[in-house]
Amino acid sequence: MEFYTLKEANANVDLLQKTFDHLATLYKLITDLKNDSYVVLWEREKNHNKHYGKDDGLDLNQLELNRIINQIEDLIDPIIQKGIIVRDIKKGLVDIPSIKEGRIIYLCWVSGETEVSFWHEIDAGFSGRQLI
C-alpha cells in the first residue's frame, strides 16, 4: 500500500477533479440511456410487443452502455493504480492512504473541494471526517 503526505495528496486534486467531472458527464449519459430503455420497454408492453425487435433501440443502448462502462473503467484505473481508493463514483469520493502518528489513516477528498482538507480513521468512514 502506498502512503501519501498531504502535499502529495493535494498534488493529485487536479487529476481527481478532472476525472470526476468527466465521470459526471458519463453518469448523465447512463441515466439518459436508462430512461430511453424504460420508454422502449414501456412502449413494447403497451403495444403487446408488436412491431418491436432489434430496431427498437435497446441493442444500441446496450452497446452504448458497454462503451460508457469501458470509458469509466479507463478513467478510474489510473487513480486505483496510484493506490487511491474510489469510494463513490457519483459523489466523487476518494480515500487516500496516509500515516498519522504512526497509524494508517485516510485523507479524504470529495469532488468540488479545492484541496484535501479532511482525514478519518480507516474504520470511521465519511461520517468520521475531521478537519486537518
Regions found by a protein language model. Give the residues of each.
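Structured domain cores in non-transmembrane regions
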Residues: 29-70
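Histidine (H) residue identity feature
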Residues: 22, 48-51, 120
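Long, hydrophobic N-terminal alpha-helical segment
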Residues: 1-43
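Glycine-rich, aromatic-bearing surface loops/beta-hairpins
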Residues: 66-132
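Generic structural signal for short, flexible, solvent-exposed coil/loop and linker residues
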Residues: 5-8, 12-15, 22, 54, ...
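Intrinsic disorder/low-structure terminal segments
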Residues: 2-3, 51, 117, 125
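Residue-level signal for alpha-helical context at structural boundaries
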Residues: 26-28, 34, 48, 90-93, ...
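Mixed-charge, polar/low-complexity N-terminal
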Residues: 4-5, 11, 53-54, 59-61, ...
